[in-house]
Structure formats: C-alpha cells, structure tokens
Amino acid sequence: FLWGALIKGAGKLISRVVGSLKKKKQ
C-alpha cells in the first residue's frame, strides 16, 4: 500500500478545505 500517495492526497485535500474556509471568513 502506498502510504506516501495517500498522505499527499490527504494533504492536498486538507489544504484545499482550509483555503476555502479562510476565503469564507474574509
């Protein structure tokens, strides 16, 4: 199982969600 790919995908998803949340707050 490729844990590195999974972690990379999760990181991208989390950063995307955090970015959208920051935009909504502004």
Curated annotation (Swiss-Prot):
Keywords attached to this entry: Antibiotic, Antimicrobial, Fungicide, Membrane, Secreted, Target cell membrane, Target membrane, Toxin
Cell location: Secreted; Target cell membrane
One Gene Ontology MF term: toxin activity
A biological-process GO annotation: defense response to bacterium
Expressed in which tissues: Expressed by the venom gland.
Gene Ontology CC terms, in alphabetical order: extracellular region; membrane; other organism cell membrane
Pfam families: Antimicrobial_4
Function (record text): Has a broad spectrum of activity against both Gram-positive and Gram-negative bacteria and S.cerevisiae. Has insecticidal and hemolytic activities. May act by disrupting the integrity of the bacterial cell membrane.
Family affiliation: Belongs to the non-disulfide-bridged peptide (NDBP) superfamily. Medium-length antimicrobial peptide (group 3) family. Ponericin-W subfamily.
Protein name: U1-poneritoxin-Ni1b
Organism field: Neoponera inversa
